[in-house]
Curated annotation (Swiss-Prot):
Cell wall formation. One of its GO terms (molecular function) is UDP-N-acetylmuramate dehydrogenase activity. This is UDP-N-acetylenolpyruvoylglucosamine reductase. Its EC number is 1.3.1.98. Keywords: Cell cycle, Cell division, Cell shape, Cell wall biogenesis/degradation, Cytoplasm, FAD, Flavoprotein, NADP, Oxidoreductase, Peptidoglycan synthesis. PANTHER family: UDP-N-ACETYLENOLPYRUVOYLGLUCOSAMINE REDUCTASE. It catalyses: UDP-N-acetyl-alpha-D-muramate + NADP(+) = UDP-N-acetyl-3-O-(1-carboxyvinyl)-alpha-D-glucosamine + NADPH + H(+).
Length: 314
């Protein structure tokens, strides 16, 4: 990896355990884990990877992500403090792709701005939230994003307008394009700060009560299918609540969460996901779709997605 790190000005670690960088606390080592110093450093790293034929991917907060037990062959990029700036201009909020989404929501509410408060409990980076069109409580990123700056797989900076992002339910164009979100422009609206703060506290209290925050997890595992029953309700109806394989367990608090009760492996989680899907299909006649992004499943090779991780409602 010396040909990759020679001109790199940021931080880098070899054979870095990905269990340190995912909310499931699961995952084997990455060949190289890199935190760029700035946009130019990031662009240069991507160009060198391309020139040398070395695969790369980006990881934000590590939620909604399962890394294979064998780890990742290639470069894993994480956007740190250099990509966590934020700026307000009237109702327009500009922020770096590495910003914590929940912190950004609180920042906006403290300024009396409405539109991002839905994200107060979403454990994702801003870049990941945009890539997956994260949403909760009736809100979604597509409603507030006006433009997105990305660095593509050739190391070029490109800007997409909101209407060019192909937003749909938990989807954007960045799920089919290899690019890293470095900056996002959002437009909010004025609101009642005290009312917004009360609303956020109510939602966070509900989250603490209904979600298994005491154990490592990656957020909701399955997308809610069309119809009146949620994925969690279907899993519970199928009798899978509390079911475990190895160290991985369907949460006894919320059936659409799989928790790491200690020592869980990626193989445990994948086997449990398959078991849940099979039982729900046999019992309810509905095939659940997983929203977990699995990385390194082909012999530990980085996949071609290039987008960041995200999280959505249960």
């Amino acid at each position: 990896m010396t040909q990759i790190t020679r001109d790199f000005r940021g931080q880098w670690m070899q054979q870095e355990p990905m269990s340190r960088h995912t909310t499931w606390k699961i995952g084997g080592p990455a060949d190289l884990f890199a935190i760029p110093a700035d946009e130019a450093d990031l662009a240069g790293l991507i160009r060198r990877c391309r020139e040398k034929g070395i695969p790369w991917m980006v990881v934000g907060n590590g939620s909604n992500l399962l890394v294979a037990d064998k780890g990742i062959r290639g470069v894993v990029i994480h956007l740190g403090r250099a990509f966590s700036d934020r700026r307000l201009d009237d109702r327009r909020l500009t922020a770096g792709g590495g910003c914590a989404l929940s912190g950004l929501a609180r920042f906006a509410v403290r300024a009396g701005l409405q539109g991002l408060e839905f994200a107060c409990g979403i454990p994702a980076s801003l870049g990941g939230a945009v890539a997956m069109n994260a949403g909760a409580h009736g809100g979604a990123m597509e409603n507030i994003v006006r433009w997105v700056d990305v660095i593509d797989d050739e190391g070029r900076i490109r800007r997409y307008r909101g209407e060019e992002m192909d937003f749909a339910y938990r989807h954007s164009r960045l799920q089919r394009e290899k690019a890293i979100v470095v900056r996002v422009g959002m437009e909010l609206r004025w609101g009642d700060r005290e009312a917004l703060e009360r609303w956020m506290e109510e939602k966070l209290a509900l989250r603490r009560k209904s979600q298994p925050l005491e154990f490592p997890n990656a957020g909701s595992v399955f997308l809610n299918p069309p119809g009146s029953l949620s994925a969690g309700q279907l899993i519970e109806e199928a009798g899978m609540k509390g079911f475990a394989i190895g160290g991985a367990q369907v949460s006894e608090r919320h059936a659409n969460f799989i928790v790491n009760r200690g020592g869980a492996t990626a193989a445990d989680v994948l086997a449990l996901i398959d078991a849940v899907r099979a039982r729900v299909l046999a019992t309810c006649g509905i095939e659940l779709q997983s929203e977990v992004r699995v990385i390194g499943d082909s012999g530990g090779q980085v996949d071609g997605g290039g987008t960041e991780d995200s999280h959505q409602r249960g």
